[in-house]
Amino acid sequence: MRKEKILFIFSVSFVFLAFFLLNTYTPRTMDDFHYAFKYTDSGRSSERISSILDILTSQFHHYFISNGRTLVHSFVQFFSFQKNDILFNILNSMAIIILITLISVYLKMKTGYNKFAKLWLFSFLFFWFLVPSPSLTLMWKAGSVNYLWTSVLIMGFLCLHHNVSTSGFAERWWAPFLIITGILCGWGHEGLSVGVALGLILYHIYNYKKISISIIYLVIGFLIGTSIVILSPGILRRADGLMLTTDIFSFVVKRLMAFYRMFFEAQTKATMIIVIVMIVQFFRNRFILKEFISKNSLLFFCFISFLIFQLLTAFPGHARGAMGLELTAILLLLSYLINIRSEISIKAQKIIMPLLIFILLIDYSSALSSCIKNSASVKMLVSNYIDSNNGIVRSPFPKKFLNDRFLWYRYSSDSSYPQNVAFSNFYEHEKPLIVLNAGLYDQLYSGGDLFKKYNLIDLKSGFYTSPELDCYVAKQSFKDNSQKKNVKINCGFDSFFQVIKNKHIVSLMDRVSRHYSKKTEAKPLNTEKGSYLLIFKYDLPKRISAREIIFID
């Protein structure tokens, strides 16, 4: 028992300190800038948040304009006007501790595993390695409050739901508490609340004979909270056209692409693992699989609901949209491993935990080192931008970080890129932020070989590029080039595929690539050295490069 307490205290202390340091070296980004300003009836204003009253009026308008996440975004706006980030860093680190503790409590109640310290550490290790896009779900203010803190509410609700289901709370005077608690837990982020709400409905329809009046109060509260979020005028306006389309082909293609992103681009590692585990168990021993699903039926219904929800909404491009799906997958995976622990040899059990801790320490060290470098780069970016006359700065970021899982540092040479716009507004610079990568900046300002014949992509349009650039560049003969131009890009496979020696495969790939084209915009860039048009390579799929660029009238 003493060893268990020591292990638990040490684990909690280490995790708190580890995340406090990561948060300390995580600068503002994206929506952290946006939510520093008030919302009015006409949208986001240029007036900064300065008081609690400002937050209340701002969130009232935000509900009708943007989305219904009033509770979480109230916290985001509260942290946005603090003079420093110490309070947020402490609370966000505590949120990690609370979430892992609630996961462990829930698993203990469901499985009966009573070695809580080991369960807590094991839960954290799985969470660390499997949580989707930690840079967007655990670190920055808006992201962590929307996803991490909402996950705390969801796990707290699941623990309370299990406790009420098994122990009663039959007294009528508990009703207000259960309803209000349900509302608060459901009134978070629709990406997490909707899947749980659908799972609860399916679960209680399936187990309608076991439902109690206390559970009805709790579930009704959660459904009310979820409804407040998803029925807000702001979120309905944003979702307009997301679910419906007059083109059946487009509808099907978007959902197929959503399925692809879900399993291959959105870092849904836990989902892939638990799906594979259940498929293997189906062929190995269907009785064990049936028993596992029966014991975890609520989680299973939530998991299926999240899958359906993600596919119907064509799945968000960022992995953070999979937070609810991955959270339930992690719970199912941990529950499964606890149930089959007797089948794992004692020797293997003794090896697995130290091995995971060793990998964690290496991963954390590289992540913290990268966060420190990123923080220094952002400070340099702010300083250079404030001192600049035209808003154009050389990117201070390394070409590649050692470990970028906990980083979000995407600034662009496109002044209309959301990160750039938010940054410019926050620092009140009259010129929009334009971050040129080191290669492009040096080519344009220090002279180089960019505009040589061997870098020419298309003679008619006059676009050039080189491997280290993130865009295609064309000179303009006139000053003050402020007009975007529509272009059509005819594409081909890039040099990556030159390693293929089979002439038939190369010929086939070449013919296929010639049929791929994309319409996009060439955006203006005015510097004291000249005027240019830029086409960003991130507009094209990976391993695809421009073969011909045509201006469209």
List the predicted regions and their residue ranges.
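Membrane-interface transmembrane helices that cradle and orient dolichyl/undecaprenyl
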Residues: I154-W174, K210
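Membrane-interface micro-motifs in multi-pass membrane enzymes
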Residues: A117-H162, T268-T271, S305-Y336
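Individual alpha-helical transmembrane segments in multi-pass integral membrane proteins
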Residues: K83-I98, F127, S144-V152, G186-W187
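Signature aromatic-anchored transmembrane alpha helix within multi-pass, membrane-resident enzymes
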Residues: W174-A175, V219, L223, K295, ...
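Transmembrane alpha-helices and membrane-interface helical segments
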Residues: I98-V105, G156-N163, G199-N207, I274-R284, ...
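Intrinsically disordered, polar/acidic, low-complexity terminal segments
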Residues: K5-S66, T70, S80-L99, I103, ...
